Amino acid sequence: MSGSTERQRVKPRREPHSGPVAGVIFDMDGTLVDSGLDFAVMRREMGLPDGVPLLETMENLAEAEAIRCRAILLRHEAAGAARAVVLSGVRRFLDRLRGLGVRQAVFTRNSREVADATLTRCRLDFELVMTRDDGPIKPDPWAIRHICATWGVVPAQVAVIGDYRFDIEAGIRAGARTVLFTRGRPSESLPGADLAEFHLASFQQADQLLRALGL
């Protein structure tokens, strides 16, 4: 899991994709489910500066400090998985995609154990779930490319939906369509808003997005 990709400048797409999508790849926390994770609290407990990416920062810590911080992270993630709830409109949106023959996957910076526990609790089932235990983490595009290769499609045939810039940056680097899920928040205040091809405020109001994705 390398943080080097994150430091590279990502430019927004100037030319929108065309044609219907064959698959949609979702972020998990904050997009499909609300697990109440507070990364600012985690950073304070770990003694890390505000705003730094947790996983990449922990890679560069001394072994004893990294072990301590990982234990804090896992404790918060496990608590989040135990209280996770599906966000409004998500089930209906997934059902609509399924009815249209659109494949669905998840990519997350969570561990395999936590991702599986979260999705099981929320009764969400996906064909593929890629976690930090499987390979390079977003904003690296590896997981998106792996999913596309498994599906036998090119990234331009999929849309990536997430609530943070790492999701959007990974999608752009892979060559996928990108959708920032704003959850009703002012988009100008959200990291990645200037990069995303589309913005989505609510899964309950996704008709326009589906049309934009050729569905």
Q: What residue spans do the PLM features occupy?
A:
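Polytopic alpha-helical membrane proteins, predominantly small-molecule transporters/carriers
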Residues: 105-108, 118
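Metal-dependent phosphoesterase signature
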Residues: 61-95, 100-102
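Asp-based, Mg2+/Mn2+-dependent phosphohydrolase catalytic module
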Residues: 1-22, 92-99, 112, 116-215
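Conserved phosphate-coupling serine/threonine residues in phosphotransfer and NTP-handling enzymes
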Residues: 31, 108-110
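Short, flexible loop segments at the rims of nucleotide/cofactor-binding pockets, characterized by
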Residues: 3, 81-85, 107, 136-137
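Alpha-helix N-cap/helix-start and coil->helix boundary motif
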Residues: 39-40, 87, 111-113, 165
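Active-site neighborhood of HAD-like aspartate-dependent phosphohydrolases
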Residues: 2-65
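Hydrophobic alpha-helical core bundles mediating ligand binding, dimerization, or RNAP-core interactions
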Residues: 39-43, 73-77, 115
